[in-house]
Amino acid sequence: MTRIKTILLLAVTSIFIITSCASNKEPEPQELEGSVKTEVLEHKGTALGINELPVWVDTYVSTGISGLEKLSDYQGSYCFVGEEIGTNLDAVQTWASTFDVSREIAATVSSRVDSLFTGASSGSPDGDYGTYFENIVKASANATYSGARKINDWWILIRRYDPDSRKKHTDEYRVFVLYTIEKETLDQQVLNMIDAIAAETEGTSDAQKTAINNVKKIMESEGI
């Protein structure tokens, strides 16, 4: 089952331990109960003698998108990560090669636009912005955004095990696909959409137009 996430991927009780053990066998899931720990058995770089996970993977797993966007390599960009989990390496690699980031971008932008307008409102967003609020959230979720660039993809084979009995474990592959968009590029697309929806929305009062312009000022200085 495909899951795209932009949140912390592992439970706080889990840890990553890079080991030199490589497995060519199909992982055999076993029942786990209670607290579990996690270790990396193998990853994309293992065959090339690369022991450490890429910084972007390690950062994303540990701190999510917010941590990833603080790395010097991605300052000035918005980051989007797609993830697939499965028990077959070929299957997750195929997923990574065909991953379409557009839906992830649209969902993220819509969520951030919703939060931006809600946070800037003095009361109910519907009261401050009228029908415009609903229109802009819908439009941002359905829009197609340009400028996304694939940076890298990486798979890891993870073993989740019972610390009291390592024989009780499950193995799974996780693949991550990283895309970025320059903040200036995406912000301008969203600002253009804000103006377009405002022009199309009927019955917007002067007070609501002022509230919308205030949100634009916040976005121009801070981004989405």
Where are these regions (language model features)?
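Sec-dependent bacterial lipoprotein signal peptides
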Residues: 1-22
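Domain-level marker for long, solvent-exposed, non-transmembrane regions
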Residues: 21-224
